[in-house]
Structure formats: C-alpha cells, structure tokens
From Swiss-Prot:
EC number: 2.1.1.173, 2.1.1.264
PANTHER family named in the record: RIBOSOMAL RNA LARGE SUBUNIT METHYLTRANSFERASE K/L, RIBOSOMAL RNA LARGE SUBUNIT METHYLTRANSFERASE K_L
Function: Specifically methylates the guanine in position 2445 (m2G2445) and the guanine in position 2069 (m7G2069) of 23S rRNA.
Locations listed in the record: Cytoplasm
Molecular-function GO terms, alphabetical: 23S rRNA (guanine(2445)-N(2))-methyltransferase activity; RNA binding; rRNA (guanine-N7-)-methyltransferase activity
This protein's encoding gene: rlmL
Catalytic reaction annotation: guanosine(2445) in 23S rRNA + S-adenosyl-L-methionine = N(2)-methylguanosine(2445) in 23S rRNA + S-adenosyl-L-homocysteine + H(+); guanosine(2069) in 23S rRNA + S-adenosyl-L-methionine = N(2)-methylguanosine(2069) in 23S rRNA + S-adenosyl-L-homocysteine + H(+)
Lineage summary: Bacteria, Pseudomonadati, Pseudomonadota, Gammaproteobacteria, Enterobacterales
Name by which UniProt lists this protein: Ribosomal RNA large subunit methyltransferase K/L
Entry's Gene Ontology cellular component terms: cytoplasm
SUPFAM superfamilies reported in the protein's UniProt record: S-adenosyl-L-methionine-dependent methyltransferases (SSF53335)
Disulfide cysteine pairs (residue numbers): none
Alphabetically ordered keywords of this record: Cytoplasm, Methyltransferase, RNA-binding, rRNA processing, S-adenosyl-L-methionine, Transferase
UniProt xrefs under Pfam families: Methyltrans_SAM (PF10672), RlmL_1st (PF22020), THUMP (PF02926), UPF0020 (PF01170)
Domain spans labelled THUMP: 43-154
Amino acid sequence: MNSLFASTARGLEELLKTELENLGAVECQVVQGGVHFKGDTRLVYQSLMWSRLASRIMLPLGECKVYSDLDLYLGVQAINWTEMFNPGATFAVHFSGLNDTIRNSQYGAMKVKDAIVDAFTRKNLPRPNVDRDAPDIRVNVWLHKETASIALDLSGDGLHLRGYRDRAGIAPIKETLAAAIVMRSGWQPGTPLLDPMCGSGTLLIEAAMLATDRAPGLHRGRWGFSGWAQHDEAIWQEVKAEAQTRARKGLAEYSSHFYGSDSDARVIQRARTNARLAGIGELITFEVKDVAQLANPLPKGPYGTVLSNPPYGERLDSEPALIALHSLLGRIMKNQFGGWNLSLFSASPDLLSCLQLRADKQYKAKNGPLDCVQKNYHVAESTPDSKPAMAAEDYANRLRKNLKKFEKWARQEGIECYRLYDADLPEYNVAVDRYADWVVVQEYAPPKTIDAHKARQRLFDIIAATISVLGIAPNKLVLKTRERQKGKNQYQKLGEKGEFLEVTEYNAHLWVNLTDYLDTGLFLDHRIARRMLGQMSKGKDFLNLFSYTGSATVHAGLGGARSTTTVDMSRTYLEWAERNLRLNGLTGRAHRLIQADCLAWLREANEQFDLIFIDPPTFSNSKRMEDAFDVQRDHLVLMKDLKRLLRAGGTIMFSNNKRGFRMDLDGLAKLGLKAQEITQKTLSQDFARNRQIHNCWLITAA
C-alpha cells in the first residue's frame, strides 16, 4: 500500500477527496491544498490517469528537521536514492519554502541535488544528470519552518496539462480548475451545455471529456514515473488500455451537444484545435459571436446549462463595459433561456449582481492568487406578460425623465455638454454628465457608515441602467469616484491616455479629456458665466486668473476682447488653454498665457484690465503656492489686489464653490467696491437642482 499526496487548488480539496475515493483510494485525509491518501500500485496509476482535479500526485519519501544546511543535506541523503532511479535517469529538484537557515530556494535545491548525486558517487555508481526542462524524475522538497518534506512527483508536468492545449496559449483557468467548475455547475451530462465567452474552450472541453468518460491523462506524452525504478509498466499499460476503451465507448454513445462562442476569432480557432486534439471536436460547435448575439440554440428544448468564466477587470475604466456585459447576459438569460440553468465563475461577485438573478448555490475557490466565487442560478420560464426588471428602476426612471427634458433644451441652446443627473435621488448618489456622445458617471464617495459591498453593487446597477437608458456603447461611459470637491482635488491626475474630445459650447470649440483627470477640463456649471463674459468682453482687455484650461478666455476672445491674459500655476493646463485658443483661431500676441502662482502674480502685476474673471479654489496649500489660501478668509485681500488692476469702469466676475460663502460687503465698501450677486442668473436648467454648486458675483467700483 503506497502513501500518496494529491495537491489541488485551494477550495477544491473536498471535491478531490470524493474523486479519489471513487477511484478506490483509502484513508483519505483533507489538508489545505490537497489530500493524503493510500492505494496500491494500480491506484497510483489510476489517480494519475483519471484525476481531473489533482494538480500533482506525490509519493512522499520522508521528512527531516532542518536547523542547518548540513541537516538538509544529510536528511536527503538518508533516502535510498540508488533504488529510486533507473540507470541513466535524469532528474530535477523543485524546492519551495524558506527558514532561518535556508533563505534561498535555489540554494536549497542545490543542497538537495548535491545530496542525491553524492548518494550515487559514494557507492561508485554513475552520477545522474540534472535536466531542468524534461527530467525523468522530479524531486519535490517543501520546507515549512524546521521540517523538510521530500517526495517524488509522479506527475512530471502538472496534471492540468492534459496534452490538448498548446503550452504557449494563455488560459485564464487551468484545466483542473475548469473540471471543478464543470462538476459544481449543476450541469448533467447528456443535456446541452453552452459557453458564450468560451475563449480557448477549456470549460467545454473538460465537460465533454467528463461526459464521454475520457480520462484527462489519456493524451499526455510524459510522466514523472518514467525514470522511477519501481514503475510497473505492465500495470500502467493495463490502466492506459482501459482508459482508451472507455473513451471510445463513451464518445460513440454520447448523444448531446456542446456550444461555444467568443467575439475573438483567433481564440475560437484555438478552441477548435484544442477540442480536436482532445478527441471530442465533433461534439462541440464553436462560433465567432458576441454575447449580444447570444441566442438559445434549442428554443424548443431540451433545457440545458449556460456555463462560463466571464472577464473581470481590476482597472476602473474597464468596469462600465463589464457591468454592461453582465447586465446584458442577465437580460438574455431571462428572455431566451427560461428553464435553463446558469453557472458563472468570477473573481468579482459584484459583477455577478448585475445579472439581476438570485443564486441557488455558490462555491468559493482560488484561481491562482485570486479569490473567486462560482454562482449557480435557475432561470425561471418567462410568461407572456412577464417584463424583465431593470436594475435601479427608480434611478432609471428619473434619468429617462431628465433625458427627455434636457436633450431638447441642450440642442436648442447649442451645447453638447450638460448634466443629466445630480444625486436627484439620495440613494443613487452620482452625477451623470453628457459630453457629446460620451457620458461621465461620477460617484460621490459613500460615507464610511455605508457598507462598501452594497455601495459597489448599487454603483454597478447605476452603470447598467445608465447604459440602457441612454443607449450608449459601454466604451463610451467613463466612471470616476470622487469626494465632494476639496481644494486642489480637481488637479489630481488619474491616467495617461491623453485622449481629447472636441466639444462645442455655444459658439466655442473646446477640448475635454474624460479619463486622465478627476475633472474633464470644462466646469459645466460655469457655462452661463462664460457666455456672459463673452457678451461683456467686446473691445476690452480681459484677465483670467486661476484659469484652468482657459475656456472662459476662449469665450472672451470670441466675444471680441482686445486682448486676453490667462494665468495658472499648472503648465499642463496652460498648454491645454493654448490648444483651446488655437482651436478657435485665437492666436498671436493679443493672447498671453502666463504660468505663475496666481496670488503672487497678482501682488506684483501692475497692468490694467477692463474685465477680470477669477474662480479661485475654496482652499489651497499647494507646495508651489507661497501661502495657504482660504477663499472665505482671504477674499477681501484678493479684491484689494484686483482693484489695483481694474481699469476705471471695469468689472470683476468673482466665483467660487464654497458652500455657504458670505461676501464681506462692508469690507468691500471700505475698499471702494460694491458687489452684485448673480448666482441665480448663472445657473442653467441642468444645475437648477443644485443651487449651491457655486456662487457668482459682479464687482465694480462703488
């Protein structure tokens, strides 16, 4: 009776134990990452040939305590290696784990290799050669704290390498994990199975091999026992012959079918090749098809199972497309696959919530370093009067209502960029802005009292509903998460795409960047203020302080300003402003751009202007600014400096975003200035719901 160990992916240990017991293994004991078991020589070969779940089958040889590198050397050498190796057999050592003595796995492997080689030379036997790439024998040593466990790896290459997949091909899941996903899916062999995002076909191929009683090891060319002196070739050939007979019989008797599709023609070609090499190509129909084209291949029955490992992303900019994909799949399942089962394996449970289906069962597993979940659903049969529910229905209805109202208004106004939704419903705490045929969804960061998982699920529902209501392509939706504006947050850089979109605002053409920064380069709430500046600027010298991307300067220039001066501390935004000016034909000496700390520049400047626009941050303590600035505390100092630059009869338009800002009218009067609040006049229809988004004033000589 041999003592053996089968390793597997985390989360699959109990499933592997059942599989090994069905093969005839006894004394099975589950540990993290595998199963210890016992069996005769035939069971050794059967576990190698038939286990769909084991990563490797090991033959433990012994353990030793390792307090020094000499302990490791002597512990390994104590094993009778000369009775383990066939003459001329090559070997390789895989060493994992470290302790205070063995701090490098390569060093540990070298000490093991030396001990094995010396075991032969001490008996005056030819020393075995090392072959790291294709050894006849693999020795596995695992060091945990002070104990080293030594074993022969009878698998050779990992058992997930069935022999049907090109090793160069990238697989998101190993074949062993794919087999477990099939087993847990609830699918019954003999019923249809469909994978609408099949990639190279691994799930379908593993299912077809299982259904046709085809051993997963049948197509492997190399094994780890080929150089093992105790290998029994006769028993191995019996096990192999039995597997071949069962495979032929299973294929001949199988009557159901498998269906796979993917939008990538290259991976579909690879899937067809893999299925053919696995010996079950005739059972699977592969098609190049997007999920949006998914249809029930058997509308008249029988019912089957949809099984897939859909894509999931770590990057924020990939989420809208993935949310739309899962939402679409959920709708298609309800519309076309009533009575079927659905099973999805994913590293993102939140994405699975976009299906709008209730899971009957779920399982956890590891896919490499990723924590994953597999959820099984039963899709109820639809009735003639059944209507699929939309995620975030209240939000969708409000967005639909706003769209009807603002789309026509924006067209009449001659603007392409406007706010469609601004946290109208407190439970859907986002802003939705339209930029031509693009949409930006900004999630206001939820309070810490809100469960993060629930908040994320709600955001996914919002995105799915937004895409559906607006009828936009998922790649035209940009998702951002932000807190309510604080100081210089608007300048935070998020990416490096450098993709600019040209939009129109009245008679101005402007560049926006929807992805690289927290803001887009165009503050939509200041749209009317910019138009007013254009109407006030004819024949005047115009100054724009804290200019951002210079959109106000563009309006002033198009309004006929004699000259424009644009000042900002950021070189990036000044270059952006220059591009905006050039886009509108505003070039030459009349249009100056100055990179400077605006407060310092203001104190030193001695020029005169007829019209000044200033939109300072609420608060700023930038390292590049000489002093911290607070708009409530410091606005009178600002006005004093601005008055010095203001030509007789001139006007200052002053705006800021501080909620509850109070203008010091008495202080202004002492400076010889007066202020007229024009906030309500500068709020367009799309911002009428949020009357505190900014405040705006016209300031002139008293």
